[in-house]
Amino acid sequence: QKIFTTHGTHATVFLVYVRYGPGTGNIGSVLIERGQEGFTFGKPIRFLSGEEWNPLFFDNVYVPKDKVLLGPGGFKKQMAGFNVERIGNTARSLALGRYAFNAAVEHAKTRRQFGKALCEFQGLQWKFAEMKLKLDAAQLLLYRAATNADAGLPSPEETAIAKVACNRAGFECANEAIQIMGGAGYSQDSLVEYCLRRTRGWMIAGGAIEVLLNRIAEGVFDMRFPQGPAKS
């Protein structure tokens, strides 16, 4: 069973990780087509972001030899492509934070209180300055990870740093934008509230922030820190 599969019922072919034996060294992958005997979908799950996720169930599904994509030991090779996927997640999270920031900027320039525009209040000016610092710093980390990956030098550590920075910046700036805009930002007539909901999901999807912090720490100390139970 696989619980969370984004828009799972819309796909016709599924890449499925399988175990050929115990341990990560025996993980590979196969291709399973929609409609195969024993392969069914569970009830759709609605998430905060508005997306639909579907559980997948595999009950003695037969996989022919020509549908085996990677045999035992192929998991590590396939995970190498995850750096690129995480960069995409990172860029989308940052883009949503930037959209919310820009919407709040326009609101602060046009919305007036006590006889002047919101942007003229020093307290709000500092909020916008902090938001820009977060977004611009995260963007540079994203560019570093993407540029090196495009040059054939992907770095899991650089990608992890960029994802954590962009996920945080995107969510925090969307949250701050709603606070600045008040009801106008909280309303579903505005896309800013969607930015908040969506960026919250990116902090989990594609590698939870806590998992990536472990990866960053391994780079700091140049050591592997197994998080599972100790081997006897």
Task: Locate each region found by the language model.
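Basic, amphipathic alpha-helical recognition segments used for DNA target recognition
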Residues: 32-36, 67, 98
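Alpha-helical interface subdomain recognition
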Residues: 57-60, 72, 80-232
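Exposed loop/turn and edge beta-strand positions of beta-sandwich/beta-sheet ligand-binding modules
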Residues: 12, 52, 160
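A short core secondary-structure module
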Residues: 1-40
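Flexible, small-/acidic-enriched active-site or ligand-binding loops
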Residues: 34-62
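Short, charged, solvent-exposed linker or helix-capping segments at domain edges/interfaces
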Residues: 28-29, 40-43, 64-72, 230
